[in-house]
Amino acid sequence: MGDKGTRVFKKASPNGKLTVYLGKRDFVDHIDLVDPVDGVVLVDPEYLKERRVYVTLTCAFRYGREDLDVLGLTFRKDLFVANVQSFPPAPEDKKPLTRLQERLIKKLGEHAYPFTFEIPPNLPCSVTLQPGPEDTGKACGVDYEVKAFCAENLEEKIHKRNSVRLVIRKVQYAPERPGPQPTAETTRQFLMSDKPLHLEASLDKEIYYHGEPISVNVHVTNNTNKTVKKIKISVRQYADICLFNTAQYKCPVAMEEADDTVAPSSTFCKVYTLTPFLANNREKRGLALDGKLKHEDTNLASSTLLREGANREILGIIVSYKVKVKLVVSRGGLLGDLASSDVAVELPFTLMHPKPKEEPPHREVPENETPVDTNLIELDTNDDDIVFEDFARQRLKGMKDDKEEEEDGTGSPQLNNR
């Protein structure tokens, strides 16, 4: 392939009369604002006749399968819905064209119509809860969907043959400035011991990228008459599910159990290294993952960054991580278990992707380089070089692609089974 121009994703309706074009599939949440969802829809005016073309953006939280009419609750909740009448253009929906829209309209012709959505910054990022091996249907989680369809009005039943549905993602990247180095300490006084046991732990930094090892520095000062028999280090994912009420689910994603001992009246210092990988946690039902991709293309869910004053009640899933250091202390003495207790501290940290570098508008590709995506379609080039790629999003195991809503939810994992 020669010069590579601006990449644009496209998807057509089954009857080919409606095609949506988007400049990207991932839209970045910058905390204070979110990238606008801007694109165009190409329509066949002869097919439309008296009908209109609408485009909707929906953020939905799918929290379980549809059971036998339990209190009339459905299995999904729309957190945000916005509608635009793209054709014929409605005056109230008219917005200034973005550079991408100008170029697409110039290339596609007069029957290409723009649409733009603003995503509120307090909506959740795209998160999928990992389905179990036996689960079928759509997985639980938060997703964003752009839908274009032909109808006489918004209330009319949407037919699959003349509609287009595209799943996009709202993502966050690691901030450029990390927070303070995580440290924690605690002191425990035991019965029958004059002096305490002191545990201090720290991480080498506050922000880790996915796949990066986490170094945990553990320092123990044992002035008691008891022995520390074992040291347990774990990385835990916490998912706050904010829907009808708030519930927190925790899941270990990396663990190490060391047989290191600390004798009475002695000190101990060691650095432990753990690396949380999705590959080691594939069977954990309900684990929070980034977006809606296949296992090979996704990872553990990134930490959620919240702006000050964010309304936690409308945020579907808030993800955070902590390292827990636990000392297992020997049980002995006349009082047995009453005279001993485990000692633990927790270290919060951030797990995210680094902000990707901005790609230049034109990039030279060596002639012997094999294209990554075989669905890439390059149309005739001109001064506004645009490369169209089929909009295809590989799904997590157990997901459906563009099924009718009434088919959704069968066998989805339930939050209360996590």
Swiss-Prot record:
One of its GO terms (biological process) is protein ubiquitination. Residues 45-86 are annotated as: Interaction with CHRM2. It comes from the Eukaryota. Belongs to the arrestin family. Changing D390P: Abolishes interaction with AP2B1. The modification Phosphoserine is found at S412. Residues 318-418 are annotated as: Interaction with TRAF6. Gene3D superfamilies: 2.60.40.640, 2.60.40.840. GO terms for cellular component: chromatin; clathrin-coated pit; cytoplasm; cytoplasmic vesicle; cytoplasmic vesicle membrane; cytosol; endocytic vesicle membrane; Golgi membrane. The modification Phosphotyrosine is found at Y47. It comes from Homo sapiens. Functions in regulating agonist-mediated G-protein coupled receptor (GPCR) signaling by mediating both receptor desensitization and resensitization processes. During homologous desensitization, beta-arrestins bind to the GPRK-phosphorylated receptor and sterically preclude its coupling to the cognate G-protein; the binding appears to require additional receptor determinants exposed only in the active receptor conformation. Residues 1-163 are annotated as: Interaction with SRC. Pfam families: Arrestin_C (PF02752), Arrestin_N (PF00339). Monomer. Homodimer. Homooligomer; the self-association is mediated by InsP6-binding. Heterooligomer with ARRB2; the association is mediated by InsP6-binding. Interacts with GPR143. Interacts with ADRB2 (phosphorylated). Interacts with CHRM2 (phosphorylated). Interacts with LHCGR. Interacts with CYTH2 and CASR. Interacts with AP2B1 (dephosphorylated at 'Tyr-737'); phosphorylation of AP2B1 at 'Tyr-737' disrupts the interaction. Interacts (dephosphorylated at Ser-412) with CLTC. Interacts with CCR2 and GRK2. Interacts with CRR5. Interacts with PTAFR (phosphorylated on serine residues). It is found in: Cytoplasm; Nucleus; Cell membrane; Membrane, Clathrin-coated pit. 1D-myo-inositol hexakisphosphate binds at K250, M255, K324, K326. Its main location: cytoplasm. Residues 355-366 have a biased composition (Basic and acidic residues). This is Beta-arrestin-1. Keywords: Cell membrane, Cell projection, Coated pit, Cytoplasm, Cytoplasmic vesicle, Membrane, Nucleus, Phosphoprotein, Protein transport, Signal transduction inhibitor, Transcription, Transcription regulation, Transport, Ubl conjugation. Residues 353-375, 397-418 are annotated as: Disordered. One of its GO terms (molecular function) is angiotensin receptor binding.
